[in-house]
Amino acid sequence: MMAMNAKQPFGMHPVLQEPKFSSLHSGSEAMRRVCLPAPQLQGNIFGSFDESLLARAEALAAVDIVSHGKNHPFKPDATYHTMSSVPCTSTSPTVPISHPAALTSHPHHPVHQGLEGDLLEHISPTLSVSGLGAPEHSVMPAQIHPHHLGAMGHLHQAMGMSHPHAVAPHSAMPACLSDVESDPRELEAFAERFKQRRIKLGVTQADVGAALANLKIPGVGSLSQSTICRFESLTLSHNNMIALKPVLQAWLEEAEAAYREKNSKPELFNGSERKRKRTSIAAPEKRSLEAYFAIQPRPSSEKIAAIAEKLDLKKNVVRVWFCNQRQKQKRMKYSAVH
């Protein structure tokens, strides 16, 4: 009985210990499963943390380098250690990512603003030209923490502020051109030259303002006569003078080209633009015509030709005078009756 009782604990002991070892086995298996991806996850977390620290440090260095200028030369060895301690990208799980303590424990890694400013100066032109569009930045993993993206945004802003000379070469040429056009002496000389040529062409200021709409220049319509007058008298504002100068110069070139073409072919323009001049008859000829009219108010064509030859006038002038004189007599008689 005792043997049976003695066997029962030993028989039940494996049964009781089985779940215990099974639970330990499952617990260790669970712990092993949890610990296996831990380096990768931990690496990703610290990778984004390291890159965030580096991005913030570079942004602060960029702001500092703008105010203090260049104080330290560029050191390739320091650049090598700084860049080698931090991986280029956190997308590769196989590359070991160092802990942030490595930045402070290494003898070559004191956070120096002047050195980081020089490093930022050498890096940021390439990034500004490429628009930070490198493949490493274009393919970003979904596990990156949001504060990492914010730090990169601050870095982009700092790079844009610390390198105004990257845009300066492109705006240098328009600045030189605007300086030439905005010279007050040049504007004054052009206004005087424009006025003289306009008068020579026989065009009024109102005609110039109305003709500007025919140039088909975008944003330019007809202008008033007072605007052209103020331009010629230099009473417009400086900015308006600069804006109006190329428009008036374009009109002047077109008007002078049309004037030269008109002078080269006068037979095409004289027929339509010829104006009849008003004929003035001197007092002696006028008294002679009144004497002939008293004798014969309706002379024949031969008589009109003889009178014109005698008074040294054109036949058509004598004929029109007799016609006008008859109309005058009719009006006088009509007014006397009524």
Curated annotation (Swiss-Prot):
GO terms for cellular component: cytoplasm; nucleoplasm; nucleus. One of its GO terms (biological process) is inner ear receptor cell differentiation. It is found in: Nucleus; Cytoplasm. Keywords: Activator, Cytoplasm, Differentiation, DNA-binding, Homeobox, Nucleus, Transcription, Transcription regulation. SUPFAM superfamilies: Homeodomain-like, lambda repressor-like DNA-binding domains. Residues 91-112 are annotated as: Disordered. Residues 179-256 form the POU-specific domain. A motif (POU-IV box) lies at residues 56-65. Expressed in the chochlea of the inner ear. Residues 274-333 bind DNA. Acts as a transcriptional activator. Acts by binding to sequences related to the consensus octamer motif 5'-ATGCAAAT-3' in the regulatory regions of its target genes. Involved in the auditory system development, required for terminal differentiation of hair cells in the inner ear. Belongs to the POU transcription factor family. PANTHER family: POU DOMAIN, POU DOMAIN, CLASS 4, TRANSCRIPTION FACTOR 3. Interacts with ISL1. This is POU domain, class 4, transcription factor 3. It comes from Rattus norvegicus.
